[in-house]
């Protein structure tokens, strides 16, 4: 229905769609799979990236305007993972460059001396971390986010062979 087309678009879901179709294309081919991956990539690249402050937003309106400008490390991780997988699928250097932009942003904005902080406003000021759990313990740092960062960084390393990525994966 046309109502569904006008719904909000979570950037995590968009990244997962990009990862999925890129992975399927890498495994079995199929131009439709590549077309679907490219569609998800174009939306991510053209609408979800904060060109002023870095990183990807939490949620977009159907028309590509920002619905929720929160930045979450978990969200950045999925975008890095998806962009790196897309690069492996089609060798689009622009996608790899964007994955590295997000990597650099995470390493600059999300780390302290111990781990990765998770929830930020659009200007990277820390906010309450309640986006991933409606109940239970709310924490500034979780293993779930670190796990997904490692996942994204590992595929970025596979895609690029970059030593900076290798050091961060340690």
List each language-model region with its residue ranges.
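Glycan-recognition and catalytic cores of secretory/periplasmic carbohydrate-active enzymes
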Residues: 2-170
């Amino acid at each position: 229905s046309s109502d569904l087309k006008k719904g909000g678009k979570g950037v995590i879901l968009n990244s997962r769609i990009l990862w999925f179709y890129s992975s399927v294309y890498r495994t079995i081919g199929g131009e439709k799979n590549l077309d679907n991956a490219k569609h998800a990539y174009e939306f991510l690249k053209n609408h979800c990236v904060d060109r002023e402050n870095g990183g990807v937003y939490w949620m977009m309106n159907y028309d590509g305007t920002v619905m929720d400008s929160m930045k979450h490390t978990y969200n950045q991780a999925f975008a890095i993972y998806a962009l790196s997988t897309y690069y492996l699928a089609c060798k689009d250097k622009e996608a790899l460059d964007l994955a590295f932009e997000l990597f650099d942003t995470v390493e600059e904005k999300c780390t302290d001396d111990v781990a990765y902080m998770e929830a930020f406003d659009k200007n990277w000021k820390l906010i309450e971390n309640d986006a991933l759990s409606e109940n239970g313990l709310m924490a500034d740092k979780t293993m779930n986010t670190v796990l997904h960062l490692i996942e994204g960084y590992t595929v970025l390393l596979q895609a690029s062979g970059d030593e900076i990525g290798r050091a961060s994966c340690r």
